[in-house]
C-alpha cells in the first residue's frame, strides 16, 4: 500500500490486483521462466487489465488524510474489542480466584473502547460532511459500523452492487462442472467489513422491518440460518451502497 500511494501521488495510474489473478495469469503464459520474464509479467497483466472495458479492478485512489486517520482509529478499536471478546470467553474457564482479574481487564477494555468510540464519532462528524449519517438512517447500522464501512470499504457508493458485495466477500460464487452443480459459496473479501455487517444485520433483523421480512423469507423456505443472514448482509450492503451513491450524486 505505501508503494501504491507513492506511485499514485506521482501521477501514475495504479491498480492493486488480486494475487490469485496475477498468479493464474503468470501460469497461463509460456513455460519459460527467467528473472527478466518475471519482471515483465506485472506490466503485461496491467496492460491486459487496462484494455478491458468492464475491468473488475477499480483504479487505486489513495485515501485522504482524514480517511487514513479514520482507518487507524477503526483498526485500533478492533484490537481491544477482540481482546475483550477473548477475555469474556476466558471468564467461564478460569479458576474462581482469577475471575476478578479477568473482570478488571474486561472493564479496562470497555473504557478504552468507549474512548475510541468517542474519537471515531468526533472525527467522522468533523471531517466527512454528513457522509457518516447516510448509512445510519438504516436501523441496525450504527456509528461504528458506518465508520468501518467508510474506512475499510472506501469504494462504497462508487461500484455496482455486485462488485461491492464481492469486495466484502458476501457474493455467492457458482461452482459447476459438467452436469454437476455444487452449492454456491462466498469466500475472500475484507473480513473487517464482513464482521461489521454481520453485527449490523443481527440488529437489523430485529428493528428494521425490510430486513426482518427479508430474513424470514429464506428461513420459511427451509434454508439454513447462515444463508439467510448472508443474504441480509448483502441486502444491507446494497442499500448502503445505493444511498452512498445518491449522496455522491447530490454532493
Model-based region annotation:
Residues 206-251:
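Acidic, carboxylate-rich catalytic segments that either coordinate divalent cations
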Residues 88-144, 153, 205-208:
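Helix-hairpin-helix/helix-loop-helix acidic hairpins
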Residues 143, 149-221, 225:
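Phosphate-backbone recognition surface of nucleic-acid-processing proteins
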Residues 18, 38, 42, 80, ...:
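Short, conserved catalytic/metal-binding motifs centered on acidic residues
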Residues 45, 70, 149, 196-201, ...:
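Short alpha-helical scaffolding segments that buttress acidic/His motifs in well-ordered protein cores
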Residues 1-100, 107-108:
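Phosphate- and other anionic-substrate recognition elements at nucleic-acid/protein interfaces
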Amino acid at each position: 500500500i505505501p508503494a501504491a500511494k507513492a506511485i499514485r501521488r506521482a501521477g501514475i495510474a495504479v491498480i492493486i490486483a488480486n494475487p490469485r489473478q496475477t498468479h493464474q495469469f503468470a501460469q497461463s503464459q509460456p513455460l519459460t521462466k527467467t528473472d527478466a520474464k518475471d519482471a515483465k509479467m506485472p506490466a503485461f497483466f496491467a496492460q491486459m487489465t487496462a484494455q478491458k472495458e468492464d475491468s473488475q479492478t477499480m483504479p487505486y485512489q489513495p485515501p485522504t488524510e482524514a480517511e487514513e486517520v479514520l482507518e487507524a482509529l477503526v483498526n485500533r478499536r478492533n484490537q481491544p474489542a477482540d481482546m475483550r471478546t477473548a477475555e469474556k470467553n476466558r471468564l467461564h474457564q478460569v479458576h474462581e480466584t482469577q475471575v476478578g482479574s479477568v473482570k478488571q481487564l474486561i472493564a479496562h477494555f470497555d473504557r478504552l473502547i468507549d474512548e475510541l468510540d468517542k474519537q471515531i464519532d468526533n472525527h467522522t462528524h468533523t471531517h466527512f460532511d454528513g457522509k457518516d449519517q447516510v448509512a445510519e438512517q438504516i436501523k441496525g447500522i450504527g456509528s461504528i459500523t458506518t465508520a468501518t464501512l467508510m474506512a475499510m470499504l472506501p469504494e462504497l457508493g462508487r461500484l455496482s452492487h455486485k462488485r461491492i458485495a464481492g469486495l466484502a466477500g458476501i457474493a455467492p460464487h457458482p461452482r459447476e462442472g459438467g452436469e454437476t452443480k455444487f452449492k454456491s459459496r462466498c469466500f475472500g473479501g475484507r473480513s473487517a467489513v464482513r464482521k461489521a455487517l454481520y453485527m449490523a444485520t443481527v440488529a437489523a433483523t430485529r428493528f428494521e422491518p425490510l430486513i426482518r421480512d427479508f430474513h424470514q423469507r429464506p428461513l420459511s423456505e427451509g434454508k439454513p440460518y447462515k444463508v439467510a443472514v448472508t443474504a441480509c448482509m448483502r441486502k444491507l450492503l446494497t442499500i448502503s451502497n445505493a444511498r452512498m451513491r445518491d449522496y455522491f450524486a447530490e454532493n
